Amino acid sequence: AAVRLHVLIRGPGVLTMRDASAVVRELRTQRGWTQQDLATRARLSRSFVADVESGKPTVESAKLFDLFQALGYEVVLRDLATGQVLR
């Protein structure tokens, strides 16, 4: 079964899927891309991009990471206690 992403950890707080959806939408629109443009670059379906942007809480994490990579970002894990990034 695919791992489902419910939250992403960021700094001292939590980035929810609603927050992630807003980030994806903002980065996409800043680039002047349609949902289809982003989907093509990430090799995903337009409906998946729409699900992410609508805040659907059960999107597959690997595919969400692919969207961020297509937007020029990487997702990293950081220890909240030490600030150390896991590589």
Where are these regions (language model features)?
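Short, charged recognition helix plus adjacent turn
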Residues: 4-8, 76-87
